A protein has these predicted regions:
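Hydrophobic alpha-helical segments at protein termini of multi-pass membrane proteins
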Residues: 1-165
């Protein structure tokens, strides 16, 4: 795919993952707290990455090329998809429990943006791609920790209420 069209794959893939969350996760009885959205978003993203990796590896020209592709994608594409799933889940969870539409838009457009940047940069430099990916991992980790912190406060508040009687 020419590099000027490489961003389209990220837009399409993240739209598909977002659609899966909207159609299948939003109405689950088990989806009862914001952290669940991160879990489901990451699960959907890693499932997608698995299918995508099978396609790349099994459609390569030789066994040596398959190993090379699998190795590179294990350290770049899989973390990318996981991070995009965390970001999508974080903002979708905020949307689901607050109703603020801006969170819904962020849950779709931020992963699209990061995925498009990743795809575009892979056409130029693996080193720059890895640096962008490291920054993305840091961002996704900070969002996850923010939810974990909020959740621990909720748990402590519930424990306090239960201990009072």
């Amino acid at each position: 795919m020419p590099e000027h069209f490489s961003f389209l794959a990220g837009l399409t893939e993240e739209s598909l993952k977002f659609t899966a969350i909207m159609l299948f996760v939003r109405n689950l009885a088990e989806f009862n707290e914001p952290m669940d959205a991160i879990v489901y978003g990451t699960l959907i993203s890693l499932g997608f990455a698995t299918l995508e990796n099978f396609e790349y590896v099994f459609n390569s020209a030789s066994a040596a090329e398959s190993i090379q592709i699998a190795t590179i994608r294990a350290f770049t594409a899989i973390p990318l998809h996981a991070c995009c799933g965390v970001i999508m889940g974080y903002f979708f969870g905020l949307y689901a429990f607050s109703g603020q539409r801006s969170y819904l838009l962020k849950s779709l457009f931020l992963p699209m943006f990061f995925h498009a940047i990743y795809n575009f940069m892979t056409t130029f430099s693996l080193i720059i791609t890895c640096l962008i990916l490291i920054a993305l991992i840091g961002y996704a980790y900070s969002l996850h920790k923010r939810f974990a912190y909020l959740q621990s406060g909720k748990i402590k508040e519930e424990e306090r209420k239960n201990s009072l009687g």
